[in-house]
Structures are given as structure tokens and as C-alpha cells.
Amino acid sequence: VAHPPGYPAYLVLARLFLLLPFGSPALRTNLLSAASAVGASLLVADAVRLAHGGRHRIGAAAGVLAGFAFGLSPLLWSQAVITEVYGLHALLVAASLRALPVWPGAQNSLKAFAFWGAITGIALANHLTSIFLVPAGLGLALFGRACPELAEGSGRRMHSLAGAGIGLAAGVALYALLPLWASRHPAINWGNASTGSGFWWLVTGEPYRGLVFQAWPYLWSRLQAGAGLWVEQFGAVGLVAGLSGLLITTRQPAVLRWILLWLFLCFSVFAIGYNTSDSYTYLLPAFLAFAIWLGQGLAIWLEAAGSWQRVLTALFIVALFFNAVPAMARVDASRDDTAERFGRAVLEGAPPGAIIITSEDRDSFALWYWREAGYNGLGRRDLIVVVERLLPFDWYRDQLRWTYPDVQLPARPGTGWADELIRLNDRPVCRTFPDQNEVLICDSLLKPASDRLERIASA
């Protein structure tokens, strides 16, 4: 069970990709990210095509260019080559937009809102910020005029609203998998969602709620960084094209314009206000909305270009190329073997049955992976991984006792906890130092703690 809010939709799909008969577990889940990014880019292309009339050649060409612009944007590209939830987040946001009955040629069926609700519910089961999609769909069901059925009276509108609600409930029901998984006591079991309090702690993202809208002291610097990111994603030409698509609405349905603007503003404000160093990843849906505007702007340019359409298309492809080449160097992770070298050093250097104390996300997550997946056939299920920063949580201490029943743990965490751990167990105790050349330092079977142990425990 993953860290809050649990990400059940991502975990279900990741388990399917883990069934692939080749590559390491990391490679297989990386393929999920890559496939999601490709899918999101294809949906951007389709959205631009539909917004321009469906079968119009210019709309199709502009859609293809917009899809490539989004797919080659550094942020989406960086998420497509790692095991993370944000590629899938972009795909599900794009799918939710595509499912809304606002596009030319959309079927006038009340089932459309149920389908939209199911996609959006799955998006919520992947990332909680997908909540920004909900007002768009529910508002359309209540007040929209995209479908003739919606104009026939309040009864039809209430049926549409009910369909959307049923679909949402069906998608969000994926969260019910978390207590089932947690009841099996897996080695990684954030929050122990098999209890009511643990489930609520997990799915509401309680540890991170204090970070929401807490970055306002850094507002100006974040706005500057955000503006720089926009240019970095699409280049100066793409930026102008996107603004053209936003401001010049010759073919775009009015309701679609307002929905895209709503999503753009909501995700941008949330990303700027979320007080973490990597909050820029929450801008992906805003970049997606901008990519659709970019495609619409390109369509306007191509219509105005007349006989120069091919020249304009070629120039934009050149601009894409010059934006993508430096991005490729930044996002290329094929030569980054930091986690692999760390895992190899720990697995090969740890004494049999050692207790390994970690303190950060990067060494904790890496060791959880390497303990389970092994390295070149070297599995180390004998190692006991203890994440020091999680020890204040009752659910984590209970999980340790369930996962490692032979290990005696101190009753309560606190100062001298590592010394007490060594006193209670006839096992080597090690600590990871991911920033140092010597990433693992161990003290084997020392009772009472020596000076060297005290140095390690206080590090």
C-alpha cells in the first residue's frame, strides 16, 4: 500500500504491467509511465482535432503538432521515464476532458455523464488533485447546453447529474481495495488502511495537508519560476501559439474554453501554493490545457497562412526540435545508476540478518525496492529495514512487528532508540548514508553501545 493517499488506480495498473515477461520491476512500471504519457499526448491531439471541427485537415495537423509539443515538453517527458504517478495523472485528466460531452459531434446521451464520472473517479483514485475536474462535469450536467437532452428541463438535468454521480462513485470505489490489501499486512503498508482511522489518514493525505497553500511567502519567486517553466515546456513560439488559441476563439466551443481555463487556473494556483520543492509536477494538467490552446492557435495560424501552410508547419517542427534537443539531455535517466549503485552496495555489504536504519525517502524507498526485487539475482529478504522518520506512527511500529516478528523493537521511539534496538537484538545494526562514499556503516553485535555506535545513532 503506497504512501498517502494510497494511489489505488496506479497500483492496479502497475500490477498489470508487472506481469510483463521481461525486464526488471522498475523497467516494467517505467513502461506504464511511458505509455501514459503517450496516451495523454494522443488525447491532446484528438482534442485539438475535435475542437476544430473533427474531420478538418488543418485541425488534424494542428492536433498532431500539439500532441508532439505536449509529449516532448520537459516535465511530461521527465515523468515518462520514471516510476511515478504523474504520467498516469496526465492521461486520466486528458481522458476526463475527452469524455465530457462538449466536443463537436459528441453523442447526445445521458450515458456520457456516467462515462465521464467513471473516468474522473478513476482519476481521483490516482491523484487527489483530480478533484478540480469534478465541478466542470457536474456544472455541465446542471447548467450546460452541450447536449439537447440537457435543454429539455430540470428532469433531464437531474438524470445527467445522477449519471455523473454514479460514475464518480464507481471510479472512486477503487479506494476500497486499500483496506483489502492492508489486511494482508504487506511489508509496505502505509497507514494500515485496514482500520477506519488508518484508512482516513491515508486517503485524505493527512501528513501533507499542512503543505497546501502554505507557499505564499515565496509567491513572487514561484511565479517567476512558473513563468520560466512555461517557456521551457513549449518555447517562445509555442507560448505565442497557446496564447493565440486562448484569446482567439473562432471555432472553440465556449463551454470548452471556460472548462480549460478553469483547469488551467486551479492546477496552477495549487502548484504555486503547495509548499514542496517538487510542486511543479502538479502543473502537468495546466500544461495539458495549454497544449490544447497551442493546437487551436496553430490551427488559426494554418488557416491564415493559405499557401504557406507547409512552410509554417515545417517552421514549427523546427522549433519543436530545438526545444526538444536540450530537454532530452535533461530528462535522460538511462545513465543515472545512483539507486542501482546504492542498492548493490547495501545488498552486498550488509551482514546476514542485519537491521538497517534509514532516514530519508530516497534511501528508504530504494531499500524497500532492492530488498524485495534483489540485484542480479541477489535477494536479501533477510534484511530488516527500519525507517527512522516513520517510527512516531503507531501503524508503522505495528507493521514492523508484523513484518519482522523475530525482531525485538523498543516500546516507544525516542532518544537512544538505536542503542535500545541493539541491546534488544543479537543482530548487526547498520545505518545508511546516501550522500557519502560509504553508504552503509554497521556495528555488529555490540552490547552496550560503543562510542562508534553512539556516533551513528546521533548522525
Predicted regions and their residues:
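Transmembrane-helix signature of polytopic, membrane-embedded enzymes
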Residues: 44-72, 91, 107, 111-112, ...
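C-terminal luminal/periplasmic domains and tails of membrane-associated envelope-modifying transferases
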Residues: 344-355, 359-365, 374-459
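Aromatic- and kink-enriched transmembrane "portal" helix at the membrane-lumen/periplasm boundary
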Residues: 11, 19, 23-26, 30, ...
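Transmembrane-helix motifs of polytopic, lipid-linked glycan transferases
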Residues: 31-55, 95-99, 292-296
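Hydrophobic/aromatic-rich transmembrane helices and adjacent perimembrane loops
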Residues: 261, 269-303
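Hydrophobic, aromatic-rich transmembrane alpha-helices
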Residues: 147, 231-254
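Membrane-interface transmembrane helices that cradle and orient dolichyl/undecaprenyl
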Residues: 51-57, 80, 96-116, 120-123, ...
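Perimembrane helix-loop-helix junctions
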Residues: 102-105, 132-169
